[in-house]
């Protein structure tokens, strides 16, 4: 291996290591326990990285698994997200749209959304009050022959609210 190749390889390894270390440092203080926002998250009034931000994503977890279902292989994407509403315009983050593929009449190729849960957490009299989203607030909209949107609005959202939602997309291979 010549010197130029060795330098490039070493540089790439160093960059990858530093990237992994920075990701590790960022996740050390992140609350990964969904359903239980911390007092610190509830009391937060601004984001130090972006003081004018209307909202801040406190945590987003994307998990991907491969499974055998209904006699075939599929990919299961599990998404969990927690957002703090900091300003009135941040309330728009409570309006969520999830796109997915739905081939009319061909269930073997269509994606499915399962396990949708959404919650708003507010402070009242020094206690955290949890408001669950009712399934009646979930709507589906067809965009074209193949594409759909699942839309919902998390209730009781105001400045200071922490919202959480989670769902799974099951996608056949």
Label each residue range with its predicted role:
Residues 1-6:
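N-terminal secretory signal peptides that target proteins for export/translocation
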Residues 26-173:
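Beta-strand-rich, non-transmembrane domain signature
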